[in-house]
A protein has these predicted regions:
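Pocket-lining segment of extracytoplasmic ligand-binding domains
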Residues: 131, 183-276
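Short, glycine-/small- and polar/acidic-enriched structural segments
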Residues: 31-181, 188, 196-202, 213, ...
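Predominant activation on well-ordered alpha-helical scaffold segments within soluble catalytic domains
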Residues: 56, 102, 160, 206, ...
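Secondary-structure end/capping motifs
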Residues: 240-322
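Short amphipathic alpha-helical segments at helix boundaries and their inter-helical linkers
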Residues: 91-95, 292-305, 335-343
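Conserved C-terminal helix/tail region of periplasmic/extracytoplasmic solute-binding proteins
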Residues: 309-343
Length: 343
């Protein structure tokens, strides 16, 4: 597929520091004695992050196996790689920002990648300062240097969206450094004091706080309001040929959503801990609580039209949208609605 290099490279920013230090690899769903009867499904996720807790609950609690699916989870480390895996057929389902499907649509994809379930409804990153600022206001960024995200990626676009909402011009009122690789901003923040702020995903935000090197002063998720940040998608052709698999997959995810809505951050952290072996339980719990408290996860997986239009508004505002896509072309809500009915 022909992709706009800069856009696709910038999309990789969405993974960033939300990625816990795990080797790129494959994670299998729990299997039971009916293993040989399970249908194999490959899911490529943009990042392996506590931000996506309901998905890991569904894996660790065996919900996919209950629905007859043998799920293989592969971390793509970038929406460009995840989208490529879906389009090539290497992955059956992709998990990434829905803007990736809009970009592919703009490029003239003949078999569009359709979003069928929305997991997160807020941005997952935080503004970190060098000192505690209990009375922080977005106007405090005027004249300052901030380590930001890649152009065209959701983290950076949402950040600029917030600045504009607060009457600021991202190009004139402050300096946003977009030159640092997505996995290196936290290290750059601690080694070079030229920037007063950095925009960080977890676990980097919490780690900076634990080290006394930075302090979370604002949540981009709270400041932006509800935004369709990450969703599940597949090729229209795969959806047509494997409707039953998509429904079972969505049903299992909904059970994961139900779990996080009815359990404490401590309980959620214990369940997903095996997915983050290199992060201690205390840190996992703190991160889950931070996301839990800001209402990160939807109660259902339905990707509403208003959310899709808001996403395109943000893309348009950032100068990344050639032409608007029709909601019906890139979103299918049937499976998510059925999953809610089955509860």
């Amino acid at each position: 597929i022909c992709m706009k290099n800069k856009k696709w490279i910038s999309l990789a920013a969405a993974v960033v520091l939300a990625v816990t230090a795990l080797p790129m690899g494959v994670f299998a769903a729990k299997k039971d004695s009916t293993e040989e009867k399970l249908t194999k499904v490959t899911l490529n996720e943009v990042a392996h992050s506590i931000f996506y807790a309901p998905q890991y609950v569904a894996i660790e609690e065996g919900y996919f196996a209950e629905k007859g699916l043998d799920l293989t989870l592969v971390t793509g480390f970038g929406a460009d790689k995840t989208m490529t895996a879906v389009i090539s057929g290497e992955a059956d389902i992709g998990f990434m920002g829905a803007e990736a499907s809009v970009y592919a649509y703009q490029e003239g994809a003949t078999d569009p990648v359709v979003n069928f379930a929305q997991l997160t409804q807020r941005a997952g990153n935080f503004l970190v300062a060098r000192e505690e600022m209990p009375d922080f206001k977005w106007e405090d960024l005027k004249g300052e240097k901030v380590l930001g995200g890649r152009k065209g990626g959701m983290p950076e676009m949402v950040f600029e969206y917030i600045l504009k909402k607060n009457g600021m011009d991202p190009q004139k009122d402050l300096t946003i450094d977009q030159s640092i690789d997505f996995g290196s901003t936290a290290a750059a923040f601690t080694s070079d004091d030229s920037a007063a702020y950095t925009v960080e995903f977890e676990p980097s935000a919490t780690i900076l706080e634990k080290e006394g090197a930075g302090y979370v002063v604002a949540s981009l998720g709270e400041a932006s309001g509800y935004v369709p940040y990450t969703s599940y998608s597949t090729k229209a052709s795969y959806m047509k040929e494997n409707s039953e698999i998509i429904q079972k997959f969505t049903d299992a995810l909904q059970k994961g959503m139900d779990y996080v809505q009815s359990h404490t951050p401590e309980e959620i952290a214990e369940v997903i801990a095996p997915q983050f072996k290199e992060t201690d339980l205390e840190t996992i719990t703190a991160i889950v609580k931070r996301y839990y408290d800001q209402d990160t996860w939807k109660e259902n997986l339905i990707f509403e039209k208003d959310s899709f239009e808001l996403l395109q508004d943000i893309l348009e505002d950032a100068g990344e949208l050639g032409e608007r896509a029709e909601y019906e072309e890139l979103v299918q809500t049937e499976y998510a609605k059925n999953a809610v009915k089955e509860k």
